[in-house]
Amino acid sequence: GTGLFAYNADYLKQMQQLFRLDVHLVTEPELPDYADVRVMPWGWNPAIRKRMLKGGVLEKNLPTPDALDKYRMKAARSNALAFRALFYFNKIDYTCGDGCCLVEADGRMTDISPDIVDRYKEGCVFKSLWSGSGKGLCWCRHGFTKNVSDWCSRALKENRGFVMEPIFDKVEDFAMEFYSDGRGKLLFVGYSRFVTDDKGAYRGNILTSDEQVEEWIQQYVPFEAFVRIRNMMQKALETSYATSYMGFLGVDMMVCRQKEGHPYAINPHVEINLRMNMGIVSHVLSDHFIVPGGEGRFSIDCFPTHEALMERHEQDMQSYPLVVKDGRVVSGYLPLVPVTPKSRYRAFVCVTAAE
């Protein structure tokens, strides 16, 4: 509505003054004026395609329904299993992550029984084929309970399958980010580090540079091994996606403790996010909007009421005053979306000054 546009316009004006942004708002009624431009939503689905087409974007600039069907299949969590096999059979050092399988409702492992679950002495986790940001997970830490059984039954009924994997002894999360041009070339964009809760749900990103990530990872694995993992992943992704997908994609990874062999190893294929993702956002923020050497967090918070959000927003503005120099955040709290009297969520960064 008009009120929302006013808040967005005011917020954009403020950001333009702080960061010299060469951007402007486009409302839905204005879409016909941009009918021949490339549309880059966070991710694609039939509803977004229909909305863009109805709004006036030319059909030639939108993915076809058939392309969306193929995109959906390529975005399934089960695709990570092929990458697990690749790393396993090539015996890439300092990697882990085996013991995972796809459970399908076509006669192959359709009945998940306690005997199967008992293979995983430390517990296991079931993952929906389509979800993200730590959602669509069912943790099985204390045996095959009725709740777990019901979850598996629903997943088989709704999606015809799910992924089953052991619970790894995770130390930290990170990701490698890439861009596919859709014409055969897949480029490495950078790294991101993120934080999850004990149930695997996304809680935020650590704002840090690629150089800082490469320094951080060396406390766990040698840098040469890390580069080999990155190169192997880039080559595998290029083979799988570079001609059939255009856009950003991220591969979630984790550092894990090991009981045998090296003390630590990298699980390099936890999840493949075939879309724009929080890691890309945090990488862009670190590269272009945070002072070099600055560190902080990029987070998304939800609140039960807009009053609770407004109270916390005002408190953070006072506790962490924003300092911007030469178009980059030196320190402080910066909301990344307008916080209005009706808001119940916020996306923001909080940066600490570089020493």
Protein language model features and the residues they cover:
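Phosphate-binding site of ATP-dependent enzymes
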Residues: 148-203, 254-269, 277
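Glycine-rich phosphate-binding loop of ATP-grasp-fold ATP-dependent ligases
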Residues: 123-149, 175, 198-217
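A short catalytic or substrate-binding loop motif that flags glycine-/basic-rich loops and adjacent residues
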Residues: 130-132, 167-172, 242-247, 340-343
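ATP-dependent carboxylate/phosphate-activation module, predominantly the ATP-grasp catalytic core
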Residues: 178-235, 273-300
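Peripheral (often C-terminal) accessory segments that flank ATP-dependent C-N-forming ligase machineries
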Residues: 291-355
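Conserved N-proximal alpha/beta basic substrate-recognition cap immediately N-terminal to
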Residues: 6-114, 131-132
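ATP-grasp fold ATP-binding core
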Residues: 102-103, 117-139, 157-170, 251, ...
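A long amphipathic alpha-helix within ATP-dependent nucleotide-binding catalytic cores
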Residues: 202-264, 303-327
